[in-house]
């Protein structure tokens, strides 16, 4: 995880202040809360260098030329600490600029970046701002997922992998 799903990291005393939601560690632990409230605060200048450092450490552990930054389920992006910035620039802009920075970092390090596509569905035209080598891992929540999201990503010309599942995440 590099954006949302950072419960373990953002629940620590060391990095808790980088969480989008103030005092998220006070929320009772549950399957839902561990996802919903643990998005990194993109308006904090310490966030991106920390995540890049973590990615650099993880990259060394794998021989694959692909690296999944995840970047899914950023439920609280722009709702708390980065709210003012989101009002100025838009939540989709905050999302794509952050993902673009991480993707470029991976490209510079010889990796093909991948990310989960559930957030980009809302603004598929932003795929054009990402590196051409970027792979959208397209998946959905519904047992009978619609084709609309897949079609929208395909129309941008971006590479996507369809990732079917039956609540296996």
Describe each PLM feature range.
Residues 1-135, 167-168:
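Aromatic-lined carbohydrate-binding surfaces of glycoside hydrolases
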Residues 139-169:
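Conserved alpha/beta catalytic core and glycan-binding cleft of carbohydrate-active enzymes
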């Amino acid at each position: 995880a590099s954006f949302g799903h950072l419960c373990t990291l953002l629940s620590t005393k060391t990095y808790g202040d980088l969480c989008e939601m103030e005092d998220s560690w006070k929320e009772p632990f549950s399957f839902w809360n561990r996802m919903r409230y643990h998005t990194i605060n993109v308006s904090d200048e310490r966030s991106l260098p920390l995540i890049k450092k973590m990615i650099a450490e993880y990259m060394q552990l794998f021989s694959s030329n692909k690296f999944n930054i995840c970047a899914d389920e950023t439920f609280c992006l722009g709702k708390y600490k980065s709210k003012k910035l989101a009002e100025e620039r838009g939540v989709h802009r905050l999302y794509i600029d952050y993902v673009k920075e991480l993707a470029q970092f991976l490209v510079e390090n010889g990796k093909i970046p991948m990310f989960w596509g559930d957030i980009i569905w809302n603004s598929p035209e932003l795929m054009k701002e990402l590196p051409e080598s970027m792979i959208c891992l397209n998946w959905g929540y519904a047992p009978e997922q619609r084709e609309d999201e897949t079609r929208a990503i395909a129309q941008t010309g971006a590479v996507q992998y369809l990732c079917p599942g039956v609540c296996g995440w």
